[in-house]
From Swiss-Prot:
Compartments where found: Secreted
Protein name: Toxin Td3
Disulphide bridges, residue numbers: 18-69, 22-44, 30-50, 34-52
Main function: Beta toxins bind voltage-independently at site-4 of sodium channels (Nav) and shift the voltage of activation toward more negative potentials thereby affecting sodium channel activation and promoting spontaneous and repetitive firing.
Lineage per the UniProt record: Eukaryota, Metazoa, Ecdysozoa, Arthropoda, Chelicerata
Domains: entry comment: Has the structural arrangement of an alpha-helix connected to antiparallel beta-sheets by disulfide bonds (CS-alpha/beta).
Organism: Tityus discrepans
Family: Belongs to the long (4 C-C) scorpion toxin superfamily. Sodium channel inhibitor family. Beta subfamily.
Miscellaneous remark of the record: Negative results: does not affect the cardiac Nav1.5/SCN5A, the peripheral nerve channel Nav1.7/SCN9A, and the voltage-dependent potassium channel Kv1.5/KCNA5.
Taxonomy, superkingdom: Eukaryota
């Protein structure tokens, strides 16, 4: 019996609804943070934001359509 687990890629979101920044963080910050959120791997995209691979669908990622960054809560 096989089981299919949905996974997604995307930018991690901070509590403010913005992409999780990585500019002034150690080089392994994104990979470690993605791993903590059950993602397979991640990296700091253009030294600006953490991008993760193979995360569970339950993890919220930044999406242009639902962007609330800088718009209050």
């Amino acid at each position: 019996i096989g089981m299919v687990v949905e996974c997604k890629d995307g930018y991690l979101m901070g509590p403010d609804g913005c992409k999780l920044d990585c500019l002034m963080r150690k080089g392994t910050f994104c990979a470690e943070t993605c791993s903590l959120r059950k993602g397979k791997d991640g990296y700091c995209y253009a030294w600006l934001a953490c991008y993760c691979y193979n995360m569970p669908d339950s993890v919220k990622v930044w999406e242009r359509a639902t962007n609330r960054c800088g718009k209050g809560k």
